[in-house]
């Protein structure tokens, strides 16, 4: 029992130290002190901390404190994305969408955007809505799902989503609008998003 408690205490101590190190690194990054950020963040990323992996990805993507390297950026973002980091999932989706450092693959982009969107990531919700609206990446054209996603993203502060919603609503029937409202009102965070609506297409 004492050994178990000791292991738990050591793990908790490491987590607290890691959090302190990440906070220092993130603060340095935001203050444009990239050398300090790299010193604090790299060991945490190498130890598998998802937040640090994501920040390392950003540093390589932007060329801040390290040479700009999109492939390395993708590797770090993917590590964090596989651990469930929504911001990283969004970036991986965007890189697949544009073909940046990877072969362009809209279906892969959809998969990553959906993972982030289901965690409430407003940019992922907004982009996924566009993919439904304009039938991208093998998505069915579905204005109701697009409206639902933009409703969610707008509620999370996305002005782009609010503008897209205002545009698409002009093309929708009252029945479609009501379904979109009901879908967004009934959806729960961290649950699967619907892939098609009842009243549907464009």
What is each PLM-predicted segment?
Residues 21-28, 43-44, 55-62, 91-98, ...:
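Hydrophobic face of amphipathic alpha-helices that form TPR/SEL1-like repeat modules
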Residues 14-20:
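Sec/Tat signal peptide C-region and signal peptidase I cleavage site
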